[in-house]
């Protein structure tokens, strides 16, 4: 028997407002492809009101408890694992209905936050600073708190002036009673409270919390690396449907052919210079190996003809252009393979 079927049977008639809510939820579940589920445990009511006020024109929202949510999902034909839903749907939840990208909508919903004061015993979520400047506080017993917290101050015109910005709490620090009172007196609300989406449903597919907030930059890097590897493989096998791969393969083959010609001494247009250079280098190596014996045998190292400076510069520029062209071909291939990501 399903989770919903195991629920106790109600002896009293269901109130009309609950019946109407159930019908409205069922309609929303049936009408919208994407549903976000935000756990409201420990979330102040005014925070939820702020989110609804900001986004209600874009996204229908409802606050409901577990039992009615599960009944509405069942009635709408959302066939998901009952045991999994039992673990995910807890207490009162804010439901956000939409039809767009669930990941973008999660960011949009969670960015709506309300500044709140801290209470004694709270843990600082971020670094808390008291800025330099004039306050509305008058000197008195509160100066002892400034001393405890090592906040530099001056008295100007009968008011306390904070002489230097001071860090009074770091992430994880427990807020003391003195600090909470001082922050309240200064009107500093260091906590930003909002709703947090626990999971989402997109077209009947469950998206758990660990997947709702992907690292976009890391994902982008992975795609670019994969594209480069794909282009490298396409070049290696000369994959014809990718023109950039064919061009890179031709350049690679030309370089390999030139190296092979120089190695074997094959004379052809464009290989003469490489063959001669290799022969001279090999001769020099033999002369060096023979040492004094070479002079006894009358063998001398041939002096290579000095190339004009302009010719050497042109040759270097040509090589640089070829390298740049090869890099451009590899990078432009990413667009061809992945549609301009």
Swiss-Prot record:
Keyword tRNA processing: no
Record-level GO BP terms: cytoplasmic translation; ribosomal large subunit assembly
Region spans: Disordered: 301-341
Keywords: Ribonucleoprotein, Ribosomal protein, RNA-binding, rRNA-binding
GO cellular component: cytosolic large ribosomal subunit
GO molecular-function terms, A-Z: large ribosomal subunit rRNA binding; structural constituent of ribosome
Pfam families documented for this protein: Ribosomal_L10, RL10P_insert
Oligomeric and partner information: Part of the 50S ribosomal subunit. Forms part of the ribosomal stalk which helps the ribosome interact with GTP-bound translation factors. Forms a heptameric L10(L12)2(L12)2(L12)2 complex, where L10 forms an elongated spine to which the L12 dimers bind in a sequential fashion.
Function: Forms part of the ribosomal stalk, playing a central role in the interaction of the ribosome with GTP-bound translation factors.
Family: Belongs to the universal ribosomal protein uL10 family.
HAMAP family listed in its UniProt record: Ribosomal_uL10_arch
Protein name as annotated: Large ribosomal subunit protein uL10
């Amino acid at each position: 028997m399903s989770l919903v079927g195991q629920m106790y049977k109600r002896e009293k008639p269901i109130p009309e407002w609950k019946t109407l809510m159930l019908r409205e939820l069922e309609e929303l579940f049936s009408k919208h492809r994407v549903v976000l589920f935000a756990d409201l445990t420990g979330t102040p009511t005014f925070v939820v009101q702020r989110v609804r006020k900001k986004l209600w024109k874009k996204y229908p929202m409802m606050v409901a408890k577990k039992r009615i949510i599960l009944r509405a999902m069942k009635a709408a034909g959302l066939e998901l694992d009952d045991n999994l839903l039992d673990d995910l749907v807890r207490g009162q939840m804010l439901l956000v209905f939409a039809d767009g990208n669930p990941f973008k909508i999660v960011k949009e919903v969670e960015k709506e936050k309300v500044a709140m004061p801290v209470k004694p015993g709270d843990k600082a979520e971020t670094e808390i600073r008291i800025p330099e400047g004039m306050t509305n506080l008058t000197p008195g017993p509160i100066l002892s708190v400034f001393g405890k917290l090592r906040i530099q101050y001056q008295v100007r015109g009968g008011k306390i002036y904070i002489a230097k910005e001071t860090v009074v709490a770091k992430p994880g620090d427990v807020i003391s009673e003195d600090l909470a009172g001082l922050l309240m007196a200064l009107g500093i609300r260091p906590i930003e409270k909002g709703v947090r989406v626990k999971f989402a449903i997109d077209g009947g597919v469950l998206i758990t919390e660990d997947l709702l907030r992907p690292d976009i930059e890391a994902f982008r890097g992975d795609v670019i690396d994969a594209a480069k590897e794909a282009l490298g493989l396409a070049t290696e096998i000369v994959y014809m449907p990718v023109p950039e791969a064919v061009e890179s393969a031709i350049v690679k083959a030309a370089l390999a052919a030139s190296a092979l010609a120089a190695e074997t001494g094959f004379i052809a247009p464009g290989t003469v210079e490489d063959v001669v250079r290799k022969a001279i280098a090999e001769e020099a190596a033999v002369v060096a190996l023979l040492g004094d014996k070479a002079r006894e045998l009358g063998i001398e190292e041939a002096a290579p003809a000095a190339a004009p400076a302009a010719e050497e510069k042109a040759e270097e520029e040509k090589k640089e252009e070829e390298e740049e062209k090869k890099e451009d071909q590899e990078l432009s291939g990413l667009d061809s393979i992945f549609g301009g990501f």
